[in-house]
């Protein structure tokens, strides 16, 4: 079991939803938390909800200068958790270039910016903790998920490469792949969302992962098996199941 007392964690994308719920759990366990997101007003409200020592640094992960400035302001941390994300459901027939680019820039490139800003100091110290939020949608391409599924697949591959390179270095890398969570983002969906989780429940799954030495957790468990097993299906079977004509 990980010791949280005296630790300092930077949570990016923590002003609401999963990030806010996870910040509360980490903070309640004894770690100091620094919360980042774009909205200063939401960050102030989030910090007020923390049970322990907490602060906020506003940041836009789509802006490299903003990320560098925030990383300098945050300073040395024991761990960083990337939770920032944007989402629009979209079929390719309804292609919206601005939205597709935003999903890639925030969800994937934003993660690379944050990791790139914080990882060198961890490598120099020989210790640290990097937690990345993927998605069940990142295992294989899905209909109506243009931009989002691709961005999450990229994030998941990034986490796998980080894990491969940093094994034995003293830096722990972990990947959490949640399914549907009740947030402002999923309110946009006009389709059924099986096994829909509340942010607090998803945060508990993620926090449980962070207290272990495991690399990856995909949840809810039963629902996640559908996506994990889909990787072994031949294309004809996969698309007949997930994208019937």
Predicted features along the sequence, with ranges:
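C-terminal helical subdomain
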Residues: 175, 191-225
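Conserved glycine-rich cofactor-binding loop
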Residues: 15-16
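Residue(s) in the substrate-gating loop at a strand-loop-helix junction
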Residues: 135
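Conserved glycine-rich Rossmann-like NAD(P)H-binding loop of the short-chain dehydrogenase/reductase
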Residues: 29-46
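Active-site loop immediately N-terminal to the catalytic Tyr-X3-Lys motif
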Residues: 93, 142-146
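Substrate-binding pocket helix/loop in short-chain dehydrogenase/reductase
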Residues: 91-104
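Active-site helix of classical SDR
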Residues: 115, 151
């Amino acid at each position: 079991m990980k010791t949280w007392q005296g630790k300092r964690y930077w949570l990016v994308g923590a002003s609401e939803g999963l990030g806010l719920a996870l910040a509360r759990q980490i903070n309640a366990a004894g770690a100091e938390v620094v919360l980042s997101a774009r909205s200063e007003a939401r960050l102030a409200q989030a910090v007020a909800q923390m049970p322990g020592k907490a602060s906020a640094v506003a940041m836009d992960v789509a802006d490299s200068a903003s990320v560098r400035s925030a990383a300098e302001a945050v300073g040395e941390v024991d761990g960083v958790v990337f939770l920032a994300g944007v989402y629009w459901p979209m079929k390719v027939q309804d292609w919206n270039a601005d939205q597709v680019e935003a999903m890639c820039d925030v969800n994937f490139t934003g993660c690379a910016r944050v990791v790139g800003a914080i990882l060198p100091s961890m490598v120099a110290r020989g210790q640290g903790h990097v937690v990345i939020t993927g998605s069940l949608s990142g295992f294989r391409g899905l209909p109506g998920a243009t931009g989002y599924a691709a961005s999450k697949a990229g994030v998941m591959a990034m986490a796998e490469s980080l894990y491969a390179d940093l094994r034995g270095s003293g830096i722990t890398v972990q990947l959490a792949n949640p399914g549907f969570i009740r947030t402002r983002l999923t309110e946009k969906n006009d389709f059924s969302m099986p096994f829909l989780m509340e942010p607090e429940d998803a945060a508990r799954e993620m926090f449980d992962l962070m207290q272990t030495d495991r690399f990856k957790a995909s949840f809810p468990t039963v629902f996640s098996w559908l996506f994990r097993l889909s990787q072994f299906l031949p294309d004809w079977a996969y698309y007949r199941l997930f994208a019937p004509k």
